[in-house]
A protein has these predicted regions:
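Short beta-rich binding modules
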Residues: 1-13, 17-64
Length: 64
């Protein structure tokens, strides 16, 4: 997922689909608070309970 795509979800309650280190698909329901760039690690999606590496995110769906 690109930064420009993820930026559209800031402030929204979302279901985020991502791949863990074993390659298995996981889902997390979280409120997307911000995007954060960490030098040498890349961009992270900051939620209300966890941070996900943006390169591992495969999809985001807004929840009502």
């Amino acid at each position: 997922m690109q930064i420009s795509e993820a930026r559209a979800y800031i402030g929204e309650q979302c279901c985020v689909t991502w791949r863990d280190r074993l390659g298995k698909e996981q889902q997390s329901v979280l409120r997307v608070d911000d995007l954060m760039f960490v030098p040498m690690y890349g961009t992270y999606l900051v939620g209300d309970g966890e941070e996900l590496h943006l390169e591992k995110v495969t999809g985001i769906t807004r929840l009502e």
